[in-house]
């Protein structure tokens, strides 16, 4: 039986007792089924030459390493998060490309390949995750690794007009073709990748999703990531903590709109605040009868763009409360702090509306978690951005354009006044999708498809030596 090797930028600690997110839950499920290794950065800076830190529990080994301060800055802070993250979320205006950062990104991917190489066994299958590791398969191939290597991109893949603006776009595209299987959250992401590729070289496609470019053959497929709906329902049900129970009692005559997102410019938080203001302005009958709570814990607080959005939200919250607030009623609560995941699921359950309106998002698991946390007999309503990957599955949500504040305000009004029968029907349809496409289904489909790939060999390469030339200008 093939062993599974998972490679990601960060690894979940083996002693993590709870609060695991989508990637960790899916990866651990796959590793428990096949046995294997989870390899990644420890999250700490230090001496890169130190031996790998290894912990084994059952049939899973965790292997982690430190990064030097310089590599952490170049690979993680600069290229991954100041170039790839904004570009892949359609924010070229925030891209800060620096050649030394690109060189550091490549250097760290090569370093990781060197560290992983001695741990790879002949029949291992390798599953690589996310934008930090786009060149990783290429580095392994240079070192003679012919194992099956799959890649899953958790964030959006931008259109060619965006992606090809990145100075190393051609190198990144060719490196991605060294994976055997490329997985994306949505069909739009998959097609955007192929469009970018076709703009740089001739791509031969056979059997729909099998392709050859630069003499390398690979497959593309869509694997929308899921959640653990049963676990979330369990966390959401049951008695409330004392303070939350008191708050719910105090707000029994107030309808609650609730959002929780990482503080990130891709999440559309300023636009969300303005849409809520439009609701209060356009539908004054709701004033004094609703409350919008936005939880947005700080993320990458050292980056200027994130500092700017935090200050903007603080200013907007104060302005909206000053304009519309009344004695005994504060319309908007903005909390820039972290809350326990289990507590959030309980808050979801007593919320009347879940407001999830990112400007661009690979999937957005918060939307799925909100649905899973609801009481099926009296569910809340999900208002969801058309630019979240989840909108492709949760079609019974109220789908909105987050750039149109009046559209979002109208959807909020509809959600607040929706009859119970319609709420139950919409929730049941979304929950059915979430249960069918849960986190285990996601990892099982990917691993199954990766196992079906024929491992690389000289014979396979000879079959792929077809005419794939760079396109002429």
Regions found by a protein language model. Give the residues of each.
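Catalytic cores of carbohydrate-active enzymes across secretory and cytosolic contexts
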Residues: 1-473
């Amino acid at each position: 039986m093939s062993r599974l090797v998972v490679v990601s930028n960060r690894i979940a600690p083996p002693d993590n007792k709870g609060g695991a997110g989508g990637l960790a839950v899916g990866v651990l499920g796959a590793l428990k089924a096949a046995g294997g290794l989870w390899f990644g950065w420890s999250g700490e800076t230090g001496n890169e030459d130190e031996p790998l830190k290894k912990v084994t529990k059952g049939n899973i080994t965790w292997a982690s390493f430190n990064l030097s301060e310089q590599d952490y800055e170049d690979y993680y802070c600069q290229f991954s998060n100041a170039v790839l993250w904004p570009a892949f979320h359609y924010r070229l205006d925030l891209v800060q490309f620096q050649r030394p950062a690109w060189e550091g990104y490549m250097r760290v991917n090569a370093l990781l390949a060197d560290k992983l190489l001695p741990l790879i066994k002949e029949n291992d299958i390798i599953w690589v995750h996310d934008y930090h590791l786009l060149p990783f398969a290429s580095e392994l191939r240079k070192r003679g690794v012919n194992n099956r290597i799959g890649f899953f991109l958790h964030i959006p893949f931008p259109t060619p007009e965006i992606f090809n603006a990145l100075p190393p776009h051609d190198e990144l595209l060719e490196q991605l073709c060294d994976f055997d299987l490329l997985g994306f959250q949505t069909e739009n992401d998959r097609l955007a990748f192929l469009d970018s590729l076709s703009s740089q070289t001739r791509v031969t496609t056979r059997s729909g999703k099998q392709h050859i470019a630069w003499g390398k053959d690979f497959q593309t497929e869509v694997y929308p990531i899921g959640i653990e709906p049963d676990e979330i329902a369990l966390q959401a049900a049951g008695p409330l903590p004392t303070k939350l129970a008191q708050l719910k009692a105090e707000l029994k005559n107030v309808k609650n709109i609730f959002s929780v997102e990482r503080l990130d410019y891709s999440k559309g938080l300023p636009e969300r605040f303005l849409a809520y203001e439009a609701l209060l302005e356009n539908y004054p009958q709701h004033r004094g009868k609703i409350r919008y709570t936005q939880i947005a814990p700080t993320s990458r607080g050292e980056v200027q763009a994130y500092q700017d959005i935090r200050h903007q939200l603080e200013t907007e919250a104060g302005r909206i409360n000053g304009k519309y607030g009344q004695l005994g009623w504060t319309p908007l609560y903005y909390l820039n702090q972290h809350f326990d995941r289990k507590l959030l699921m309980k808050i979801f359950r007593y919320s009347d509306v879940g407001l999830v309106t990112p400007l661009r998002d690979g999937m957005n698991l918060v939307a799925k978690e909100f649905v899973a946390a609801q009481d099926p007999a009296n569910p809340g309503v999900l208002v969801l951005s058309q630019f979240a990957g989840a909108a492709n599955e949760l079609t019974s949500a109220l789908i909105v354009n987050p750039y149109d504040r009046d559209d979002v305000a109208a959807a909020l009004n509809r959600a607040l006044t929706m009859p119970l029968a319609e709420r139950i029907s919409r929730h049941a349809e979304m929950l059915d999708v979430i249960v069918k496409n849960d986190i285990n289904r996601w990892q099982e489909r990917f691993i199954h498809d990766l196992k079906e790939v024929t491992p690389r060999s000289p014979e396979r390469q000879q079959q792929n030596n077809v005419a794939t030339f760079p396109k002429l200008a």
